[in-house]
Design a protein with these regions (language model features):
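Non-heme di-metal
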Residues: 5-205
Length: 205
């Protein structure tokens, strides 16, 4: 049907992103093979994303557009957390203590010292992390049977794709465009290497 085709086109669009290493089919297989574990990790990731937005607006209180955008983002990510919680509780699961995210930890190593480059790196790594989330939620949506859970993951893929654009727009608002382009290129390579070398598990990263 027309709608089915349209929805599929949206998924295709989500999967086309700036990322330089495509998530392997083995990742989707691992997630679908232990979906409970994936959900628990996913909840933690949403909660941390909300915390990250709050940390950004606390760090840069004088950048009005950023503060407003991060306040909205913190609420949106926490709403996603609340929605994932519903799926978790519906399955009779209990949330688990936070664990370090090896992907985010490795990517954060690339943040440089110095207020301007640090600000740039925070915005660009956040953007790339959102792009990876959009790609992976779209893969999950594609693998799930038609129904509310599939719809949920499709909506998350859309929202992560919006956030990926948001962080890039904020960078363009506050920083030199040549500087952005050069660093964007470097960070995309760094992120691709991280994803290529990390072990595959039933987790967002």
């Amino acid at each position: 049907s027309m709608t089915a085709r349209y929805k599929h086109t949206i998924i295709d669009r989500m999967l086309q992103s700036p990322l330089r290493f495509a998530t392997l089919p083995a990742w989707t297989t691992a997630v679908m093979g232990d979906f409970d574990r994936f959900l628990l990790d996913h909840a933690t990731a949403e909660k941390k994303a909300s915390g990250m937005a709050i940390s950004m607006l606390s760090h840069y209180p004088d950048r009005t557009d950023l503060v407003t955008a991060m306040a909205d983002l913190a609420i949106e990510e926490l709403t996603h957390y609340r929605e994932v919680l519903k799926w978790i509780h519906q399955r009779g699961l209990i949330t688990t203590p936070d664990q370090k995210d090896p992907y985010v930890g490795a990517f954060r190593q690339s943040l440089r010292q110095g207020s301007e480059v640090y600000f740039l790196d925070r915005l660009l790594t956040a953007s790339i992390i959102e792009a990876r989330g959009a790609e992976r939620f779209a893969l999950v949506a594609e693998a799930l049977e038609p129904g509310p859970l599939k719809k949920f993951y499709l909506s998350l893929a859309r929202s992560e794709a919006r956030h990926f654009e948001l962080f890039l727009e904020l960078a363009q608002k506050y920083l030199d465009h040549d500087m952005i382009a050069q660093r964007w290129d470097e960070l995309l390579d760094i992120e691709a290497d991280i994803v290529a070398t990390l072990p595959i598990r039933a987790a967002l990263h």
